[in-house]
Amino acid sequence: MTDVTIKTLAAERQTSVERLVQQFADAGIRKSADDSVSAQEKQTLIDHLNQKNSGPDKLTLQRKTRSTLNIPGTGGKSKSVQIEVRKKRTFVKRDPQEAERLAAEEQAQREAEEQARREAEESAKREAQQKAEREAAEQAKREAAEQAKREAAEKDKVSNQQDDMTKNAQAEKARREQEAAELKRKAEEEARRKLEEEARRVAEEARRMAEENKWTDNAEPTEDSSDYHVTTSQHARQAEDESDREVEGGRGRGRNAKAARPKKGNKHAESKADREEARAAVRGGKGGKRKGSSLQQGFQKPAQAVNRDVVIGETITVGELANKMAVKGSQVIKAMMKLGAMATINQVIDQETAQLVAEEMGHKVILRRENELEEAVMSDRDTGAAAEPRAPVVTIMGHVDHGKTSLLDYIRSTKVASGEAGGITQHIGAYHVETENGMITFLDTPGHAAFTSMRARGAQATDIVVLVVAADDGVMPQTIEAIQHAKAAGVPVVVAVNKIDKPEADPDRVKNELSQYGILPEEWGGESQFVHVSAKAGTGIDELLDAILLQAEVLELKAVRKGMASGAVIESFLDKGRGPVATVLVREGTLHKGDIVLCGFEYGRVRAMRNELGQEVLEAGPSIPVEILGLSGVPAAGDEVTVVRDEKKAREVALYRQGKFREVKLARQQKSKLENMFANMTEGEVHEVNIVLKADVQGSVEAISDSLLKLSTDEVKVKIIGSGVGGITETDATLAAASNAILVGFNVRADASARKVIEAESLDLRYYSVIYNLIDEVKAAMSGMLSPELKQQIIGLAEVRDVFKSPKFGAIAGCMVTEGVVKRHNPIRVLRDNVVIYEGELESLRRFKDDVNEVRNGMECGIGVKNYNDVRTGDVIEVFEIIEIQRTIA
């Protein structure tokens, strides 16, 4: 046998190199991974493993078999006797040295028998050959004698007859020789057949012994120890069944015994227990009643903890997690309580929590990504490879009323601001403008504080931010917020100093204020371009456009024009006649009419596309804003728009996203922890203002909801019962009536059926077109729900000059009113050395023995304090009243 390396041997044995090296070390042989192993070292390792993994020397098997025997008794009744047969077998394992010695003796005996057999065969061959030779010689002698007699008798025959006789004799001799050779060949074949049968018998015996002892040669240590009892018990049980079968063979010669005897080659042969049960049934009597049971001892592995591979999705309930780990739900809840979280068996937990619990209980966690379908749909898109220059997307940002829309208005030469309520931009407007030097796409964002999220979306979807600052107003709160959004998005800023034509304009002050927030002009060594413009007079507009195009040229903006389009939702709303409408800004590719789009939780086929002027278009390239129709619902502003191939898969992805959003929302709900329970117990009564909100566009719904929720205080909370895009319907009115809510419509109206419900239920319906008015009126409604503030106001002081005793009232204080007025039945305080020693109320107020209701400053009176008699000279009685002050929401 050639030498092999440790690595090769490890691969053959299907074990690790480190484990094989450790086994060699345990056997006293030091090896590394690249060393070779000789046959002798291999044998040493096998002997070591066999010695290490040898099982117990003695194995005892006990078996019980129970059956019932019915014995006829007196009175015609049979008596049942329980019979229990106990058997005990002990199997002793031979010592390895003794086994080797016995094997050597058996081998020597087999060799001796083989040698004797060969000698016997050779001797038989020699005897047969000698016998054949003797017979041939005797036959030859007899034939010679006969021939001599015939020759003597026939001397007179002619010479030709003598020649014929000689030829016949020669032929007969050849025949006899052939018969002798055939006999010899048959003897050799018989000997060879006996040798082959003996060799097959020895090989079969060796193969059977090798199979029985196979576990001692190749199995791993852990496998040996775990399978030993099973294999040994099987062999022992087979041996016992064989011996019992031999004993039983001589007993039953009748029909039942023949029926019970297993047929040769029957794979479904009955076990010993079945045979004993059948014999008990035969002995049971005429009725064939059988009340026997077989108790058979089994060998089972002891129960122990099983570590499993637990596959966990993004969300999972506690019960599902318990099923995956094959444990009871109470054990999982107990483990979560140890980790500091309380949960019920049906509660949805997130992936991180489930991972902690499973690892705490000793299982291996496999985190599953549930968005394989979404990734497959997104990867199956035909996008072109060549990128071409595209138009810049410019967002105009700044404080409210600083002239953003007017500036864009002048650029587009249309009056947009007049259409906006109150002159304030309520949602994002997307327009593209053709100039002499190229095309520019503008996004006009609101400047009011309520529209923070809309400004953030505008900054994320843009390439360049034009920051409009009024020269007469300077930097304002929304200006600072716009700077923060631009920096967060990493977008360059071009500053347009507007209203430069006003007399009080101060551009230098604007530069100084902006420099404090990191916006430095180029002449000061910064990177931002400052352009002085006037949206009213049209001053500096061309310079602003040149600055934008210059900045775009520096950025080297490129996009893929061919292929399937992708973009973002700038705004969305529900049109009564057209259905869901979404304003989409295409980022790359070309969007065609008829494309299948996937947009957040919604999907659909583009039925129509319109530009910002309301004109029908068939396609839109990069940096082009369009309105699309045909979606299944109103998408959320900011969602990604992607063109896909298959509408069915798009629907599946949209439904998956909806379910995922719902599961994550449930998983993130507030958990029932002890501190929350105590907080809920100590929390007082909280008033709620319920509102059902409907607006014209999705961005307005978000902005108004955020602003109203920020108004909530500890005493009064704003609760948005329902919100949506579109007009107020009968469903909205019914919801408001059921939840006692206020109906608020922002740039929308109620339809006829909704108005009937509103009149019948006397609901509070309010329309708004400017967000200021909406927020102010909700503040007023919340202020009315605030509990009034109670304030103590001192109305008079009386100094005790003397104390009198009255049988009816006890101690009466003779007082002089020094300040204000003293009123009867008002609460008072008794002060001694400017320290309050008693607080109560006046019981009696008299002047010249007459009861009076009040005593004014500078007059004397007698005061009786209710339930208090320790009034002394020099005390001061302070009279006050409690007034209510109505609070307001700041």
Curated annotation (Swiss-Prot):
Biased composition, class Basic and acidic residues, residue ranges: 92-217, 267-280
PROSITE patterns per UniProt: G_TR_2 (PS51722), IF2 (PS01176)
Region listing for Disordered, in residue ranges: 45-304
Chain intervals for the UniProt region annotation (1): 1-103
Span list, region 2: 104-287
Annotated GTP binding sites: 398-405, 444-448, 498-501
Biological role: One of the essential components for the initiation of protein synthesis. Protects formylmethionyl-tRNA from spontaneous hydrolysis and promotes its binding to the 30S ribosomal subunits. Also involved in the hydrolysis of GTP during the formation of the 70S ribosomal complex.
NCBIfam families registered for this protein in UniProt: IF-2, small_GTP
Protein's recorded name: Translation initiation factor IF-2
